[in-house]
Amino acid sequence: CYQAEEEVLKFHLQEAMQRVNMDAQPNGFATIIMDELNPDKIKKLKTACHEIAVKGDFIKYKNIYSGVLTECSSQSAGIQLADFAAGIMNGYLRGALLSRGKYEFATDLFNEFILPNLRHHPDGRIMGYGVREVPSDTTIRNKLSALFER
């Protein structure tokens, strides 16, 4: 099943925007800032972000800026922190799903810094709140649930 890159980017961005908007409610405000390394992809993401924010979906984006701002990652502590978190998550998932036992350091960092800060339901569930599979896939969700719902 092939989908155009723009649609895939829009789908992932929409997932992120929904989470950010929910966390910013009722009185907060959020802005999405991305690394400016890939101008073509940034242009597609900016277009997708604007379409989602203006045309909307089932969520009204009142608490999120209707565009994407870009910044050089070497000058942005926020982007560097996001890269650090993504790297830890990548290492944790690789170790848990692909090569058990070879990613102890990433697992330790995940348990100390990422897991306690993941968005979760009031009952403690992380899947569907702080971790979502995109697009929805029951097989992948079951594998991830085993890792995040301890």
Region locations from a protein language model:
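A two-mode feature
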Residues: 1-150
